[in-house]
């Protein structure tokens, strides 16, 4: 199980746009926590703490310990709304998780040993990461903070598919149960010449369609 991280919160008494605006001016983020067998609860968070937390990968993919006035609930971040141009978080949604109920979450992929691989050592090869995260299903205790993809043996022309990712125990990729066409490429190592030919072919197709 990935390490959990504590987020402090307080119950929010006032609701509505006016109340939310006042909270933001005071350096507080309006938020909500829902799910499980409990009713949704309007809460508020310290903007400075959350601003620092949201700069870390774990904030988006880990089980969080939401400390709500001393009552600790395990939650996942489900939505974060940001101001379009200010360094300001507008609202956050958390979902409670149950220890015995599987959850769905997006987990980041960490690519390792790429530079040491045959493909990575070649100046004539472009290694493309087609996916940077993957949707998984598992129990909360099994949720990984990230999944490593070892590229140490990557050769020129190789393609690593979703089904080839080594998953931690108890973790599944639901997309793979929906058919072979869902077994998409995660990493591709192409010779630069082939990469350029593919790009030229796509541009030609687009030009033909616009005529």
Swiss-Prot record:
<dbReference type="GO" id="GO:0006412">
    <property type="term" value="P:translation"/>
</dbReference>
<dbReference type="InterPro" id="IPR037121">
    <property type="entry name" value="Ribosomal_bL25_C"/>
</dbReference>
<keyword id="KW-0699">rRNA-binding</keyword>
<keyword id="KW-0687">Ribonucleoprotein</keyword>
<feature type="region of interest" description="Disordered">
    <location>
        <begin position="1"/>
        <end position="20"/>
    </location>
</feature>
<feature type="compositionally biased region" description="Basic and acidic residues">
    <location>
        <begin position="1"/>
        <end position="18"/>
    </location>
</feature>
<dbReference type="InterPro" id="IPR020056">
    <property type="entry name" value="Rbsml_bL25/Gln-tRNA_synth_N"/>
</dbReference>
<dbReference type="InterPro" id="IPR029751">
    <property type="entry name" value="Ribosomal_L25_dom"/>
</dbReference>
<dbReference type="InterPro" id="IPR001021">
    <property type="entry name" value="Ribosomal_bL25_long"/>
</dbReference>
<dbReference type="GO" id="GO:0022625">
    <property type="term" value="C:cytosolic large ribosomal subunit"/>
</dbReference>
<keyword id="KW-0694">RNA-binding</keyword>
<dbReference type="GO" id="GO:0003735">
    <property type="term" value="F:structural constituent of ribosome"/>
</dbReference>
<dbReference type="Pfam" id="PF01386">
    <property type="entry name" value="Ribosomal_L25p"/>
</dbReference>
<comment type="similarity">
    <text>Belongs to the bacterial ribosomal protein bL25 family. CTC subfamily.</text>
</comment>
<protein>
    <recommendedName>
        <fullName>Large ribosomal subunit protein bL25</fullName>
    </recommendedName>
</protein>
<dbReference type="GO" id="GO:0008097">
    <property type="term" value="F:5S rRNA binding"/>
</dbReference>
<dbReference type="Pfam" id="PF14693">
    <property type="entry name" value="Ribosomal_TL5_C"/>
</dbReference>
<dbReference type="InterPro" id="IPR020057">
    <property type="entry name" value="Ribosomal_bL25_b-dom"/>
</dbReference>
<dbReference type="InterPro" id="IPR020930">
    <property type="entry name" value="Ribosomal_uL5_bac-type"/>
</dbReference>
<comment type="subunit">
    <text>Part of the 50S ribosomal subunit; part of the 5S rRNA/L5/L18/L25 subcomplex. Contacts the 5S rRNA. Binds to the 5S rRNA independently of L5 and L18.</text>
</comment>
<dbReference type="InterPro" id="IPR020055">
    <property type="entry name" value="Ribosomal_bL25_short"/>
</dbReference>
<keyword id="KW-0689">Ribosomal protein</keyword>
<dbReference type="InterPro" id="IPR011035">
    <property type="entry name" value="Ribosomal_bL25/Gln-tRNA_synth"/>
</dbReference>
<comment type="function">
    <text>This is one of the proteins that binds to the 5S RNA in the ribosome where it forms part of the central protuberance.</text>
</comment>
